[in-house]
């Protein structure tokens, strides 16, 4: 596991699991490769090789072990903003579909986390009542026009959501904040 970071390295990702951790400062010489690697899907995409500042090797997205990353955020001062596409954190990835793994649970490491996620009411306004995802390529098959139409509708709803979020930030309403 390699974490590319800006500013002083955080102790947030210290040994909390069995995987090692190397920190690399992000700079103009490695930011493009680090961002590209963060979107390179293991087994599907080619790796980014030998990122400047890091040990030589191949780099992919860490989603296999760090998807829905659960770190000891409570070690940090203040509130940690966690924009996400679902209203809960399920650490791990490969076993996420197991019923006992999918249930949202409170965790002490999330005590100071403000998770921002779409509401059920928002999702109900989207085509298929969900955010677009890679499964849509299977669902729509070769009907690209329908997939694009529905994705554009979802984008328009997301833009409305962004406008509403900006309005909320201008005039916060704590009554709309929910606990994890």
Where are these regions (language model features)?
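Patatin-like phospholipase
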Residues: 1-180
């Amino acid at each position: 596991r390699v974490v590319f970071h800006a500013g002083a390295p955080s102790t947030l990702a210290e040994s909390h699991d069995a995987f090692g951790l190397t920190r690399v400062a992000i700079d103009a010489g490695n930011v493009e490769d680090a961002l590209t690697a963060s979107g390179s899907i293991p087994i599907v995409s080619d790796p980014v090789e030998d990122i400047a500042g890091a040990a030589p090797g191949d780099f992919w997205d860490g989603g296999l072990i760090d998807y829905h990353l659960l770190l000891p955020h409570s070690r940090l001062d203040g509130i940690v903003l966690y924009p996400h596409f679902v209203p809960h954190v399920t650490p791990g990835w490969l076993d996420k579909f197991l019923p006992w793994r999918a249930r949202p649970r409170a965790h002490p490491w999330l005590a100071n986390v403000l998770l921002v996620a779409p509401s059920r009411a928002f999702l109900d306004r989207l085509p298929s009542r969900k955010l677009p995802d890679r499964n849509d390529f299977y669902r729509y098959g070769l009907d690209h026009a329908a997939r694009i139409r529905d994705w554009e509708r979802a984008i328009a709803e997301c833009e409305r959501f962004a406008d509403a979020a900006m309005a909320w930030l201008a005039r916060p309403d704590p009554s709309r904040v929910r606990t994890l």
